[in-house]
Design a protein with these regions (language model features):
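Structured beta-strand/loop patches that form or line metal/cofactor-binding pockets in enzymes
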Residues: 1-27, 31
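A generic structural signal for short
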Residues: 4, 77-78, 119-121
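Solvent-exposed alpha-helices and their adjacent loops that cap or buttress functional pockets
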Residues: 7-10, 106-108, 136
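Short secondary-structure boundary/capping elements
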Residues: 10, 100, 123-127
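Broad gene-expression machinery/nucleic-acid interaction feature
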Residues: 13-15, 83, 111-113
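Metal- or metallocofactor-binding catalytic centers and their adjacent structured scaffolds
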Residues: 19-95
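N-terminal small/glycine-rich loop or linker at the start of catalytic domains
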Residues: 22, 71, 95-120
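Metal-dependent enolase-superfamily TIM-barrel catalytic cores that perform enediolate-based chemistry
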Residues: 110-136
C-alpha cells in the first residue's frame, strides 16, 4: 500500500533496558530510525542517564533533551530520550508495585478498541492481512 509518505514493509525499533542500583530494570522503546536512535543512545544519552534518579523522570528527560540542542530536540533525539523515559516509568511502576497507567492518572476506560493508524504497509493487501494475523 502506498501512503502520502510512500510505502514501507519493515520497521525497526530500538529496545532499551535501564538497570537501577537497587536491581530493578525497566524496558523502553524508541521508534524511528533505529540506527540513529541507537547511536544517540550509545554515544550520548546513556552516559547522561547513568547515576540519575529514575523517579525524577521529567528532570532526566530534560537533561537528555538539553544534550540535543544542535538537533533541535526533534526526530531521532526525541525517540532516544523517549526510550529511556519509558524505561524509567516501567522502573517506577515496578518499584511502587503499581501499573504505569496509575502513575499517569489512572484507569479511564476498562476496554479500548484496538486500531492501527500507521501499520506496516505492504503493496499487496493480502500480504497486509497475513502480517496483521501474525502480530495479533
Amino acid at each position: 500500500m502506498q501512503i502520502s509518505r510512500g510505502g514501507f514493509a519493515i520497521r525497526n525499533h530500538t529496545l532499551v533496558r535501564v538497570h537501577t542500583d537497587s536491581g530493578i530494570s525497566g524496558l523502553g522503546e524508541g521508534i524511528g530510525n533505529a540506527l540513529l536512535v541507537k547511536a544517540i543512545l550509545k554515544e550520548q544519552m546513556c552516559e547522561l542517564a547513568v547515576g540519575q534518579d529514575p523517579f525524577n523522570i521529567e528532570a532526566l528527560r530534560q537533561r537528555l533533551l538539553d544534550s540535543q540542542v544542535y538537533f533541535e530536540r526533534q526526530g531521532s533525539a526525541i525517540c532516544a530520550a523517549s526510550a529511556i523515559e519509558m524505561a524509567c516509568w516501567d522502573i517506577k511502576g515496578k518499584a511502587l508495585g503499581v501499573p504505569v497507567y496509575q502513575l499517569l492518572g489512572g484507569l479511564v476506560q476498562k476496554r479500548l478498541e484496538a486500531y492501527a493508524s500507521d501499520v506496516y504497509w505492504q503493496k499487496d493487501p493480502s500480504d497486509m492481512a497475513k502480517e496483521a494475523l501474525r502480530v495479533v
